[in-house]
Amino acid sequence: MKTPICDFVDGYARSDALRLHMPGHKGAGEIEQLDITEIDGADSLYEANGIIRESEENASRLFGAQTFYSTEGCSQCIRAMLYLTALYAKSRGHRPLIAAARNVHKSFLSAVALLNIDVLWLYPKEQTSYLSCKLDADTVEQALSQAPHAPDGVYLTSPDYLGTLASVESIAQVCRKYGALLLVDNAHGAYLRFLQPSLHPVDLGADICCDSAHKTLPALTGGAYLHISEDAPAMLREQAKNALMLFGSTSPSYLILRSLDAANAYLDDGYSEKLAEFVARLQGLKEKLAAHGYCLWGDEPLKLTLMPKTCGYTGKRLAQYLLEQKIVCEFSDPDYLVLMLTPETGEQGLKRLEQALLSLPKRSAITQAPPAFHSCHGVMSVREAMLAPCETVAAQASLGRILAAPGVGCPPAVPIVISGERIDEAAIECFSYYSVDTCTVVIE
């Protein structure tokens, strides 16, 4: 597969041109020489009609959708998805309403606030962590049938941060029945398209989807895709670039664009076979760990999520143990340890991880359970709360206050309490359990 962005950028780096344009480093350095701006021939991300357009068309063929690049991660794509849904709502003649699984990324909340979108929160029949929210089609259908008016979209995070895949295909059928778009935050699952069979949300019926290429593919941090299904309303494809432009910088990184372009060639050159081989090896490791006594969570092929309390360790303590072995995990909390692997981890990397985990001394199981997940009562809209006068207070002193901004870091960037909800005693208990020290609350 051709790599037009790589070819142009690399050719310019070799040209010995006197750079009297941005950036200020003038190409002095191994990395800097590839960091260019929109010079003649370099195209323009949001008005693409040259090398960027050609590269995006290559990505579209690979993903079986109309694919657009982001250099600002899925955060930009999520905001664009909600903007497109707001346009869809306008075409239907009412205020936008989105039914969303509760474990949304905080960029969803910022988009809801900026775009003044109403949200109907969806909860699973059983929930053990605020990071996971696996819905079935029946739960979604019940919510849509009882909504004040037909929601314009249903929003899922799949895979979620712990590695749980949603029932996208059956939920897509419900969405079609009610005329709602299906939006999927697939930030952790760009590789799912290349499994046999594909588990990618677009192939399972999603209308709009975003992937963080940088999370699971060999692309630089910030590289992401916005996918619009060929079966989705045409207006979504027509307005996608405008949607991304609304939330994007006018100085997109050509280092990131170049890496997305290079990823196309990588994906086109036997990646499916390489992925299948690695997934099989990782599955073998998962089976060994389960036989050794580890409790595993989730069904995402490239994520290894452990619940190590059964072995006598919190997730935080196990992460520290691995760090001592020079193995750095993606995320840990009192209950979970999340490890993200790709074919680039390699066989030696898997063996190193296996040796570390199987040599961990076993202890008596920790029986302390996490606080029961609950939903606080919403008293303001997300927009009202996020734009209201606010102050930062100690989390333990926030009882009865209304949360303003979702002050949660990344990872995991999934809020325990939603902006506009009144903080209750159960939320205070969660703050303590997850070591949340402060929160930003509305000044009433």
Where are these regions (language model features)?
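Conserved C-terminal alpha-helix-loop-beta "cap" of PLP-dependent enzymes
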Residues: 287-425, 429-436
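Short active-site oxyanion
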Residues: 66-67, 94-98, 416
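Short glycine-rich or small-residue beta-strand-to-loop segments that form or flank ligand, phosphate
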Residues: 68-70, 154-157, 338-342
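Charge-dense polyanion-binding interfaces
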Residues: 438-444
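Conserved PLP-enzyme active-site core in the AAT-like
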Residues: 2-8, 72-295
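N-terminal "arm"/small-domain region of PLP-dependent enzymes with the aminotransferase-like
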Residues: 1-50
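Conserved N-terminal alpha-helix of the aminotransferase class I/II PLP-enzyme fold
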Residues: 32-76
